[in-house]
Design a protein with these regions (language model features):
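Hydrophobic/aromatic interaction determinants used to assemble and anchor large protein complexes
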Residues: 2-312, 321-387
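Hydrophobic alpha-helical transmembrane segments in integral membrane proteins
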Residues: 381-412
Length: 483
């Protein structure tokens, strides 16, 4: 009987090892094919980079699909991971194309913050959350259990970071090797690494191989997870101390002390503090399967939860104060959505606090886990909405600026017509022309003069600092005397 069990164990181990090797080969192959496609797109399809909105979005699609397929890959599943990767990459393709076509760098008359925010932060967060929920569904059931969501939510960043490190070290070694051979007059490999037709597929294969290798490093992933848990338990005390300090400031000096401080964009700082507290709390909470922690850890966690609604409320106050004074802009609309999501997470905090009424419960803050899963889905919808054609940040901002003038809330001489013209594109121009039709406005003459001037100006700078005649150009070109 013992012999039979040992043979069975060996067969299972061999199957697992064979599956891991196969996944590694598949990872390298997927990355290699993705690299070829990216090379072909940029070499033969993109003729003019400034106008190639669809083609650039296609580049992102190929990279996203390959990455998603490798992250979702399972040795016993093929169809579901591929379908999931197609869904994620396809949805992001639509959003990429929308923002790239709107926020093109060649269009100097439109604010590019939405595109910058999407590429630098929002897109990665949407992809991460979508992969987390998709992997959790593949591992368990739909809707996914929070224990699976948390497991994958922690594993994905670790796998990604580890794959980047492996790929970087591999590339450094290979390029150093090629450089060394060059010193011995062996130029073939050095020149080969300069060729794009070789470099893109090669980099893709290295990236795919690195991701597949990291999938199997369960011991490393577990060790890093333990370190992150330990870090969260340490920083929760700092978060609690910061919350207590902020509460003392608010009690003694009121909210005006925060908004009157010499700090730029206080709302951004407050939202950052709220999000940091959220991450630290979830690092302590883990997957929701544990018993309540010791009192020394439980108390600072509760203090951090109490502070979260305070941060989000103050961020809202700071944003609304700016909007009341200066109207909506793409940046402020984005800030409102993020602050709204932070405020919505206060419901999760409240549920966690209420669950503490059962102080001796077997599991800690049971409602938090399912609500975290729901919040992940809401985050995807909110961030995707900002990048979608359904929410036009420039049009909304232009209408808000028109409303400021139409309601006589701002003096026509102090209004920034240049921002509307040169930051809000055609939507700003449309609202500027509507301003000229406000016949009942007491400052209509000033409005019409300013609108005519800004519409005829070639740039924001020349609108703000107009040159009246050619002599000023000549004077500007003359060298300044050393005397």
């Amino acid at each position: 009987m013992q012999l039979t069990l040992n043979k069975s164990d060996r067969h299972s181990s061999n199957r697992a090892g064979g599956g891991a090797k196969m996944m590694t080969l598949i990872g390298a192959l997927v990355g290699f094919i993705a690299g070829i496609l990216i090379y072909l797109i940029q070499e033969y399809w993109i003729a003019d980079f400034d106008d190639a909105y669809f083609e650039i979005a296609a580049l992102f699609f190929v990279a996203t699909f390959a990455f998603s397929a490798l992250m979702l890959a399972r040795h016993n599943q093929i169809i579901k991971p591929v379908i999931g990767a197609l869904v994620i990459a396809g949805a992001l393709f639509v959003l990429d194309y929308n923002l790239i076509s709107f926020g093109s760098a060649r269009d100097n008359d439109i604010n590019t913050f939405p595109l910058f925010f999407w590429v630098m932060l929002s897109r990665s967060l949407v992809l991460f959350l979508a992969l987390t929920l998709m992997r959790a569904s593949l591992d368990g059931s739909f809707p996914p259990r929070y224990v699976d969501v948390f497991e994958n939510g922690v594993s994905i960043p670790i796998i990604t970071a580890g794959a980047k490190l492996i790929a970087l070290l591999t590339l450094l070694l290979l390029f150093a090797w090629a450089r060394l051979l060059k010193e011995f007059d062996v130029l073939f490999f050095h020149e080969l690494f300069q060729e794009q037709w070789f470099l893109f597929p090669f980099l893709g294969a290295i990236a795919g191989l690195s991701i597949s290798l990291m999938h199997g490093q369960t011991a490393v992933i577990s060790a890093i997870r333990f370190l992150l848990k330990l870090l969260s338990r340490i920083t929760i005390f700092v978060s609690a101390l910061f919350t207590i300090t902020l509460a003392m400031v608010l009690i003694t000096k009121g909210t005006s002390a925060l908004f009157e401080a010499d700090v730029e964009r206080p709302a951004v700082i407050l939202i950052g503090l709220a999000m940091t507290g959220m991450l630290i709390f979830n690092g302590v909470y883990q997957d929701g399967q544990d018993k309540p922690p010791p009192l020394w850890l439980r108390i600072p966690t509760l203090i951090t939860l109490i502070g979260f609604p305070v941060y989000s409320s103050l961020a809202f106050m700071a944003l609304f104060a700016r909007i009341d004074d200066y109207g909506l802009t793409p940046i402020r609309i984005t800030g409102l959505v993020i602050a709204g999501m932070a405020a919505l997470y206060s419901i999760v905090c409240l549920a966690g606090l209420l669950s503490e009424l059962r102080w001796r419960a077997q599991r800690w803050m049971v409602p938090v886990g399912p609500l975290n899963t729901v919040m992940a889905g809401i985050w995807i919808l909110a961030l995707a909405g900002l990048a979608s054609p359904l929410i036009n940040l420039w049009s909304i901002s232009a209408q808000s600026q028109f409303a400021r003038i139409a309601s006589e809330k701002v003096d026509a001489e102090d209004f920034d017509y240049g921002y509307v013209r040169f930051e809000l594109g055609k939507y700003g121009e449309e609202q500027l022309r509507k301003m000229k039709e406000l016949d009942s406005h007491p400052q209509i003459d000033i409005i019409r003069d300013e609108v005519d001037e800004v519409l005829s100006a070639p740039s924001y700078w020349e609108y703000k600092f107009p040159l009246t005649d050619d002599s000023e150009f000549e004077a500007a070109d003359e060298p300044v005397s050393d005397l």
